[in-house]
């Protein structure tokens, strides 16, 4: 699925998800669209939206004791009854969720357990990660002594921007900022421990939060191949860009094309899309089984 068509006001067509206004609730449909470097590619990954939704739903249930979340229902028949809609289960089942509407906090909350990606590039240049000084001598893909919290300012369109925690503190209630940081690291630590049994290293991940009546809740997606780097533990070694089960495979391909990371992006070959789909399915299988 590339686009959804539902008889509700479309609040936002995101990079991957279509968000509809359902009064005090939101209806979210995860498409098979692919976003890399904040640009939506003209190609899709088959069943990606269903896989992301299934993984998110798994983690929302697993982490409810750490932080409440926005979930109401992911059952398409129940959603049809609640909203008095006639959504075709063949088209919308598995990729559609009904959630609580909230006040979104406009920061992406990134937790990094290992140095890689943009953090590695910055570290090579300046010895910092998101402006924070990091100890010298780290190799690519090396584990940090402790997970680090590196927020990013949230952009609906264009590039999200890495910022320091000090910047975050200066742009919102300080107590709330510290609670978000603490909760993000707790979520990361919980997932990292669980994923060890799955043969997956959680290199880094991002969370998004909102407020309902002043209470912090977890929203959007959680611990998916789109929002996380999942490395194959069997193939991990420092000094490399370890292979895994996530969107990094597509990012790496797109970097090799010579594309300047500005719109419009080039198409992704079908062979790359199918290989990415296989990686996403492997992540889902391992996560649901709780083992390799």
Curated annotation (Swiss-Prot):
This is Phosphoribosylaminoimidazole-succinocarboxamide synthase. Keywords: ATP-binding, Ligase, Nucleotide-binding, Purine biosynthesis. One of its GO terms (biological process) is 'de novo' IMP biosynthetic process. It is an enzyme of class 6 (ligase). The keyword ATP-binding applies. One of its GO terms (molecular function) is phosphoribosylaminoimidazolesuccinocarboxamide synthase activity. Belongs to the SAICAR synthetase family. Its EC number is 6.3.2.6. One of its GO terms (cellular component) is cytoplasm. It comes from the Bacteria. It catalyses: 5-amino-1-(5-phospho-D-ribosyl)imidazole-4-carboxylate + L-aspartate + ATP = (2S)-2-[5-amino-1-(5-phospho-beta-D-ribosyl)imidazole-4-carboxamido]succinate + ADP + phosphate + 2 H(+). InterPro entries: SAICAR_synt/ADE2_N, SAICAR_synth, SAICAR_synthetase_CS. It comes from Elusimicrobium minutum (strain Pei191). Pathway: Purine metabolism; IMP biosynthesis via de novo pathway; 5-amino-1-(5-phospho-D-ribosyl)imidazole-4-carboxamide from 5-amino-1-(5-phospho-D-ribosyl)imidazole-4-carboxylate: step 1/2. The keyword ATP-binding applies. NCBIfam families: PRK13961.1, purC.
């Amino acid at each position: 699925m590339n686009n959804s068509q539902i008889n509700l006001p479309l609040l936002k067509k995101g990079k991957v998800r279509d968000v509809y206004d359902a009064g005090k609730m939101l209806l979210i449909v995860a498409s098979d669209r692919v976003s890399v470097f904040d640009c939506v590619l003209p190609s899709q990954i088959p069943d990606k939206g269903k896989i992301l939704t299934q993984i998110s739903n798994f983690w929302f249930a697993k982490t409810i004791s750490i932080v409440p979340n926005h979930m109401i229902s992911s059952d398409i028949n129940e959603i049809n009854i609640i909203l008095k809609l006639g959504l075709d289960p063949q088209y919308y089942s598995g990729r559609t969720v009904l959630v609580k509407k909230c006040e979104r906090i406009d920061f992406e909350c990134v937790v990094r357990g290992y140095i890689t990606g943009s953090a590695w590039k910055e570290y090579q240049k300046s010895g910092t990660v998101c402006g924070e000084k990091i100890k010298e001598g780290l190799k690519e893909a090396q584990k940090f002594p402790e997970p680090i919290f590196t927020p990013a300012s949230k952009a609906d369109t264009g590039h999200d921007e890495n910022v320091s925690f000090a910047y975050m503190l200066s742009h919102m209630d300080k107590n709330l900022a510290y609670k978000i940081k603490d909760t993000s690291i707790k979520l990361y630590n919980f997932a990292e421990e669980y994923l060890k049994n799955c043969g997956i290293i959680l290199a880094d991940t991002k969370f998004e939060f909102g407020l309902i009546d002043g209470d912090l809740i977890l929203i959007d997606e959680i611990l998916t191949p789109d929002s996380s780097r999942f490395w194959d533990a069997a193939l991990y070694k420092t000094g490399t860009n370890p292979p895994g089960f996530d969107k990094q495979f597509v990012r790496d391909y797109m970097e090799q094309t010579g594309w300047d990371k500005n719109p419009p992006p080039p198409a992704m070959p079908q062979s790359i899309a199918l290989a990415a789909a296989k990686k996403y399915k492997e992540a889902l299988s391992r996560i649901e089984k709780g083992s390799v």
